[in-house]
Regions:
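Detector for methionine-enriched segments
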Residues: 1, 23, 63-64, 254, ...
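Long, low-complexity, charged/polar intrinsically disordered regions in eukaryotic proteins
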Residues: 1-33
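Homeobox/homeodomain signature
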Residues: 3, 16, 27-29, 80, ...
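Short, charge-rich amphipathic segments
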Residues: 7-20, 60, 64, 97-104, ...
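Long, charge-rich, low-complexity alpha-helical segments
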Residues: 22, 30-125
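Active-site histidine-anchored catalytic micro-motif
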Residues: 110-313
């Protein structure tokens, strides 16, 4: 082992102060890293060296510099690599095998299971319903007068506990509708270079199962072409749609109202080559196909976007 493995790009590091010590918590949406895993903050200066190109000899040299020039044996550097590898935060063969297994399991499942039940909201159906009903009953902070029934809603996707009144105001505006189907758009936090990720899975929460319009998802995915991710794995851990679905399930008979779940990625890089994202491959045809689906009978369709107008994080 002469070259250090690269750090995983799909995990987050959070610095915390615990029992008088600075620690680094590792947040892994795949669940490969133990939820209780923490690193000593002393290892922080060495983490940038794990880029897939730095030699273990360079790690050894940096370690000596940080220890005031004291001799550091190669075995000490190797021990750091072994510890990080064992935790599951490096791009090793064992990590790739674990990720492949998790990806296959999700791809082969007909359902997208609730990811945040039991952490961001109760996993118990009765308790979850009570929490949502309490939020929906919160008094309005200001009166909103609409010229007619809304056809689209932009709602937050932050933790329910942080934006209760905003969620209440948003979903109060659509509670009297009777949509025949719902286009569910959300910020995709893990889409990489893909513009969209479209899922045809049945979404489940403690409140029940919500089917996808599989014919429509296939049609729209085909229209998007290379703008759409070839799979829907980004939906596995994404919260932006899951939070919207909970409120929709309290307002409408969602087991009978199919959804079209779409995660949307970033497009900033497109402006280096085009004036409008619609000029990029697949995006205009995606928009046209979605618009056609919204206009199709029977009944009226509702668009719900789990997005923040000024998105950070």
């Amino acid at each position: 082992m002469d070259t250090l493995p690269a750090l995983r790009t799909d995990i987050d590091f959070l610095t915390v102060h615990h029992e008088g010590r600075d620690m680094i918590l590792v947040r892994d949406p795949l669940g490969i890293v133990s939820p209780n895993a923490a690193l000593s903050a002393e290892i922080a200066p060495y983490l940038p060296l794990f880029d897939g190109s730095t030699s273990i000899g360079n790690l050894q040299i940096i370690m000596m510099r940080h220890q005031g020039g004291s001799l550091v044996f190669r075995s000490a550097a190797e021990r750091i690599v072994e510890d990080l590898s064992r935790l599951g935060i490096l791009q090793t063969d064992s990590y790739r095998a674990a990720k492949d297994r998790i990806t296959r399991e999700f791809a082969n499942s007909p359902e997208r299971a609730a990811f945040l039940a039991g952490s961001s909201y109760p996993a118990d159906p009765g308790e979850a319903a009570s929490v949502l009903d309490r939020i929906l009953s919160l008094p309005a902070t200001s009166a909103v007068r609409l010229p007619g029934p809304p056809c689209a809603l932009a709602a937050p996707h932050i933790d329910l506990r942080v934006a209760e009144r905003t969620y209440a105001a948003a979903y109060r505006a659509v509670r009297d509708l009777a949509p025949s189907a719902i286009l569910l758009l959300g910020t995709g936090h893990a889409l990489g270079r893909s513009r969209y990720s479209i899922s045809d899975k049945t979404f489940t929460t403690p409140l029940g199962r919500v089917p996808a319009d599989r014919e429509a998802t296939a049609r729209i995915r085909a229209a998007a072409g290379t703008a759409a991710s070839p799979d829907d794995f980004a939906h596995r851990n994404e919260h932006s749609l899951e939070f919207q679905l909970l409120f929709l399930q309290r307002l409408f008979p969602m087991e009978q109202v199919p959804i079209l779940p779409v995660l949307c990625g970033q497009m900033e890089d497109l402006f280096e080559t085009v004036r409008s994202p619609l000029e990029a491959p697949g995006i205009a045809s995606f928009v046209e196909e979605v618009s056609a689906w919204i206009s199709e009978p029977p009944g009226s369709k509702l668009v719900v976007a789990g997005v923040d107008l000024s998105h950070v994080g």
